[in-house]
């Protein structure tokens, strides 16, 4: 068995692309078992707890809306190659990803980490949901089959 520790942030589009590429690579080695453990990494550890307006964030990070558009056009194109149809225009808030990482840690203990990570990426990058919002995280947890009580305990505490 090959054990993989992957450091990733739930608000990083390159991490989503990387996950898809890793899945393809693993599928080419059907005779090998892989154990993936997704480890937390925050791209923006100083992000306010409630996140910030997406456009303000992009301008502060890349210097201008035009620079951000150029970068995200490239990310969009790379995503399409991997079967991801990023919907960046639907993202209104760049969230603080801390609580999404807490949810992933619980998911690991329950053998659901891959499912939760997929749901986090899809919720944020495809649906524009604020994955820093405890209610969104709770919905994701319940959808992936946590009991409501356990999910509520993790997300709200």
State what each model feature region is.
Residues 147-154:
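Conserved small/polar residues in nucleotide/adenosyl-binding loops
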Residues 1-2, 29:
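Extreme N-terminus of proteins, especially the signal/transit-peptide cleavage junction
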Residues 2-11:
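Short active-site neighborhood of thiol/selenol oxidoreductases, capturing the structured segment around
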Residues 10-20:
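Conserved redox-active cysteine motifs that mediate thiol-disulfide chemistry
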Residues 125-132, 137, 142:
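Acyltransferase
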Residues 20-124:
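Structural alpha/beta surface segment adjacent to cysteine/selenocysteine redox centers
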């Amino acid at each position: 068995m090959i054990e993989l520790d992957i450091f990733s942030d739930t608000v990083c589009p390159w991490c989503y692309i990387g996950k898809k590429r890793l899945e393809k690579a693993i599928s080419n080695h059907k005779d090998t078992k892989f154990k993936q453990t997704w480890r937390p990494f925050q791209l923006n550890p100083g992000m306010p707890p409630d996140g910030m307006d997406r456009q303000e964030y992009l301008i502060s990070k890349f210097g201008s809306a035009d620079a951000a558009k150029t970068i995200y056009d490239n990310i969009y194109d790379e995503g399409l190659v991997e079967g991801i149809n990023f919907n960046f225009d639907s993202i209104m808030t760049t969230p603080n990803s801390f609580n999404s990482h807490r949810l992933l840690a619980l998911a690991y203990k329950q053998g659901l980490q891959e499912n939760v990570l997929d749901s986090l990426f899809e919720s944020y990058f495809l649906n524009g949901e604020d994955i820093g919002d405890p209610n969104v995280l709770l919905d994701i947890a319940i959808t992936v089959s946590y009991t409501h009580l356990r999910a509520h305990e993790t997300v709200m505490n």
